[in-house]
């Protein structure tokens, strides 16, 4: 695949939708990114994660965390490219939490790879 920027990659996979969208935050938006339009194509997912990994490659990231469900794929591929471990959060009682024995140690450098961010409240 030729070198692409993130926006052109998202447009090529028809992940950027235009119209009027009421987001789960209650906000309205003229654009929506349908992440699963990208995630169904492994080669595009890989390229997007390469962009993320390249940006953080020299930051000493030790663990990549993504939210279930869509963020798991992004965090897993990004972690593989960075040579680090990947863990994920799950919603429990309305909050995203580490479960399944996953832990982050004090001082551990973590990269959070979110699948969708509107207000940042779920982080």
Label every model-predicted segment.
Residues 1-123:
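PRPP-associated nucleotide enzymes
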């Amino acid at each position: 695949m030729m070198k692409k920027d993130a926006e052109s990659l998202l447009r090529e996979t028809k992940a950027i939708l235009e119209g009027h969208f009421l987001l789960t935050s209650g906000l309205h938006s003229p654009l929506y990114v349908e992440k699963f339009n990208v995630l169904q194509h492994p080669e595009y997912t890989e390229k997007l994660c390469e962009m993320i990994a390249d940006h953080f490659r020299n930051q000493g990231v030790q663990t990549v965390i993504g939210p279930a469900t869509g963020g798991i794929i992004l965090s897993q591929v990004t972690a593989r490219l960075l040579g680090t471990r990947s863990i994920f959060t799950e919603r429990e009682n309305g909050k995203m939490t580490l479960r399944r024995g996953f832990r982050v140690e004090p001082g551990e450098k973590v990269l959070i790879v979110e699948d969708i961010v509107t207000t940042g409240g779920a982080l």
